[in-house]
Amino acid sequence: MATLQQIYSLYDTATWATQLGVYSFYTTDGSLSYLHLKTNVPVSRNTMWMVEFVGYAYGGAANIRTAIVFHTSGSVIYRIGAQNIYPGLTAQTAYTSTDGYVVIRVLASSFYYTGFVVNAYSTAPYTPNEVFRILAVSQNNNSGTGTF
């Protein structure tokens, strides 16, 4: 069973540009490969974000350091890009939930005893000053969209 919890977070209260330790994730279930994380970022708002995952995947014997960037505007997610530094977790894509929020999909080398923290960075001066949150998470074998 996956655990998602808010942990101590650090924020730049002037701009909310850097938000460290937004959430932590830990699971021992190695049978499911994908994680879908529903955020509080509405696709209809004009924003730019980089979301970073840092941790360790024991089952895959690999460090985790991956990030995904995206730009939302006019109910579309633009310029989705991912950079995977270590192979423990791969940021794959972002898609729109049925209620209009950004969902991030990641793939693990193995979720068997895997843990990571999530950091968020607003990457445009017009991104609203708001706290980035993970609203819901689903660990499953869905390699597509539609989990949320």
Regions found by a protein language model. Name each.
Residues 1-148:
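Trimeric viral appendage architectures of receptor-binding fibers, tailspike depolymerases
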